[in-house]
């Protein structure tokens, strides 16, 4: 069951971006408190605010759009059911990614699959680029993708959360469930290994 299936209500103009009629932004914490009280509108607002980021994170882990959609459905269903258990030790967005990571890895284990993150390194093409620049971007993207795929799952995980999700060390530790010092150590070796791979491929990391 997806989030859209179990929450069907009309949303007033301006609510999907999390703003009240007075133009004030409703905090994630407040939304969670309202969800815990059974507020479906708050659930829709939280979903609209975070589902794209959580979906992209899940997609990088499972490499399949249908599976990523399944993960999203499970994540927000868990939020709906377990909002009252949120302890606010970390940001709501960190909690969402932690649940998404657990759900994605559980799904892959159930299917007996191993996912390689091939999409995270894909360069975003700029319409303003001339053909030569566009070709260079694609070449660099392909090299980065190949090097990325050679990293260990732990190192890909760390780089994804720090660079693509822009999470701080403390948030990464919370999501993965490891000490902050371990995050720092993995980050050091992940960057070192990626730099070595890129250099070996003829592209120094800048």
Residue map of PLM features:
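Intrinsic, short, N-terminal disordered tails of RNA polymerase sigma-factor systems
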Residues: 1-33, 37, 45, 49, ...
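Conserved RNAP core-binding helix
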Residues: 31, 47-48, 55, 65-82, ...
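Sigma70-family region 2
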Residues: 36-37, 60-65, 73-91, 110-111, ...
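Residues within the DNA-recognition helix of helix-turn-helix
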Residues: 50, 186-189
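Arg/Lys-rich amphipathic alpha helix in sigma70-family domain 2
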Residues: 81-88, 98-118, 137, 189
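DNA major-groove recognition helix of helix-turn-helix
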Residues: 108, 187, 194, 198
């Amino acid at each position: 069951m997806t989030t859209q299936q179990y929450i069907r209500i009309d949303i007033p103009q301006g609510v999907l971006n999390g703003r009240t009629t007075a133009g004030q932004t409703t905090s994630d914490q407040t939304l969670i408190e309202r969800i815990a009280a059974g507020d479906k509108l708050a659930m829709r607002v939280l979903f609209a605010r975070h589902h794209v980021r959580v979906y992209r994170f899940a997609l990088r882990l499972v490499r399949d759009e249908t599976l990523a959609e399944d993960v999203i459905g499970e994540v927000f269903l868990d939020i709906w059911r377990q909002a009252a258990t949120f302890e606010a030790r970390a940001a709501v967005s960190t909690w969402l990614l932690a649940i998404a990571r657990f759900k994605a890895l559980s799904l892959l284990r159930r299917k007996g699959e191993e996912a390689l993150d091939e999409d995270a390194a894909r360069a975003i093409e700029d319409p303003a680029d001339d053909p030569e620049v566009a070709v260079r971007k694609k070449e660099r993207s392909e090299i980065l993708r190949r090097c990325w795929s050679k990293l260990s799952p732990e190192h890909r995980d760390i780089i994804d959360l720090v660079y693509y999700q822009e999470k701080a060390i403390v948030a990464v530790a919370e999501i993965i469930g490891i000490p902050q010092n371990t995050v720092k150590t993995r980050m050091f070796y992940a960057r070192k290994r990626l730099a070595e791979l890129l250099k070996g491929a003829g592209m120094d990391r800048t």
